[in-house]
Amino acid sequence: MIKKILLPVFALALGLVSCERDDDKYVSTCPVIHDMTFKSVVTETDRIVAGEKFVATVEQAQKGHLLYKAEYKWSDALDEGVHKPAFTSVVYDNYSNNPSDTIVFNSPGTYKVKLVAKYHISGNADASVVRTNEIPGGKVQYELPSWMYYRVTVTKNVRVQAAP
């Protein structure tokens, strides 16, 4: 009789202890963003001129892990830029390059460029990812809106100069 009682109790205790801490290798980690950079296609410098193409690149200081899909949406605050993103959706674990967009602003001024990246989780989610970091001229906001994906929003101001 005691064996019948102790066996299920022992099995339950063993199951609870084994679930106490998940192994880190099964945790999906979000990319850590270093900065958003801007580079002219024409001069290959950071001097951005109205009417000329430039590339906005979100640089990752650390790649993500166990992310099966990434979706990228580029925009600007005034919706005045012409955007041509390199990719809008990738299998992140196979293609974890820095997201980039080719943009043209036709008028000089200061514009806020934004990337909203959605990283679909294929392992265990990490709730400690939620935070906001400052970058020069902008910020990076990390969110976990559901246990199925991370959302990373990167915004930065770019100064567009008048054509010479």
Show the residue positions of the predicted features.
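Low-complexity "stalk/linker" and mucin-like segments enriched in Ser/Thr/Pro/Ala/Gly
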Residues: 71-96
